[in-house]
Amino acid sequence: PFLKAYEFIKNEDIHDSQKTPPFVIIGSGLAAIEVSYALRKRWRNRRIKLFCHQKKINNKILKSLRNSHIELVDNLDFDYGKIILCTGNTSPLWVERKLLDFDSNGRFITNQNLKLKNCSGIFATGDCAVIESAKRPASGIFAVKVLNTLVKNLKKDIEGQSLKKWSPQRFGLQIVNLFPARNPMSFAIYNDFVFGPSFLIWFFKNRIDRNFIKQFHLKKGKMPKKG
């Protein structure tokens, strides 16, 4: 999916002109906001419109979006080009057919061991799941932090051992990069508080992101052979 999405964006590079119909991002969450900033950084001339509920977005961020020449709209009553949806996820149809427990946002309900409530042997984490006793919004922060517990519990489940419980923190610190006028900057969001934009926040996020990506780099000679 990522490669197809990346090719889709690359193919739009030739349309970086004010004469081209605007590119539209749909969504009011941080994903839609960060995608809008990233595309503005990539396309300096093309018109970009964010179709969103402005009341759901902090005023500091709204001002920054406008300063980055990202137009905020609440309808699509204009000629536009391509669209990207950043509207969150929903449960697939087979979930409803199997009568599995999920919340109003379409996320699987699990116990603290990360197992589905009424389906033995199946684990769920990340944006597709929520712990019944510790409900948190979908966020990459929780999705990353739960991984160690998930791996350990998969192993323990196979070996017939007692599973480990996981309790997410109450709030997660979220950092959003924005389109820089001169130096790169970011907002930091914690609960209802928004800090920045600041270069120091961007530096902090950049360091975290780079260290995270390094974990996925394979050393030379470690690539699996085809066939």
How would you name each of these model-derived features?
Residues P1-K41, I70-V73:
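Glycine-rich dinucleotide-binding loop and its adjacent helix/turn
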Residues C128-F179:
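A conserved FAD-binding loop/helix module that cradles the flavin
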Residues K60-K63, K82-C86, G221:
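Active-site-lining helix/loop region of Rossmann-like oxidoreductase modules
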Residues A31, K56, T90:
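Conserved Rossmann-like nucleotide-cofactor binding loop
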Residues F179-G227:
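C-terminal auxiliary extensions adjacent to catalytic cores
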Residues P22, E34-N75:
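Rossmann-like dinucleotide-binding cores of NAD(P)H-dependent redox enzymes
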Residues S28, F51-H53, D127, P180:
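Cofactor-binding loop segments of dinucleotide-utilizing enzymes, especially the Rossmann-like FAD-
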